[in-house]
Amino acid sequence: MIQVSCAIIVNSIGKVLVTQRSALMPLPLKWEFPGGKIEDNETAEECLIREIKEELNIEIEITGSLSPNDHQYPDKLIRLIPFICRQTGGEIVLKEHADYKWLDVRDLLDLDWAEADVGVVEEYLKMNVKSSESGGT
């Protein structure tokens, strides 16, 4: 099983950063939460901070986590370990991805997601519905 950490980076107005895989990557042009494979000598959190700096040129702080999501692709089994983060420095420079967007939470399901990310999107949406309901009337 390949262990991968990913970042749900939320900005100060509640928009979420999503990245589009390049045409040259596996799963070309699919959308995903940015991140990468966890190396043998690092934690999921260390991996995420390193990968986000390498891929997007920004620094992040991890503020929470979601449930790991296992997904079987035809050629590999992935365990995606998601973290909720905020950007603490740098300006986004795409080094591997084709595009990025800051989206309202309600618009996340409009994208063509990499399959492993779909469960993460769904859990994040449920979490946000519950928090908006509890802050209501």
Label each residue range with its predicted role.
Residues M1, K30, P74-R79, L94:
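A generic structural micro-feature
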Residues M1-V16, K37:
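Conserved N-terminal beta-strand and adjoining loop/helix that marks the start
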Residues N11, E59, P68-E91, D99-K101, ...:
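Active-site-adjacent beta-strand/loop module that shapes the phosphate/pyrophosphate-binding cleft
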Residues K15-E54:
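Conserved Nudix-box catalytic region and its N-terminal flanking loop in Nudix hydrolases
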Residues A44, L48-I52, S65, F83, ...:
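Hydrophobic packing within well-folded, soluble alpha/beta domains
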Residues E55-I62:
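Short secondary-structure junctions
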Residues V93-T137:
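Nudix hydrolase/Nudix homology domain
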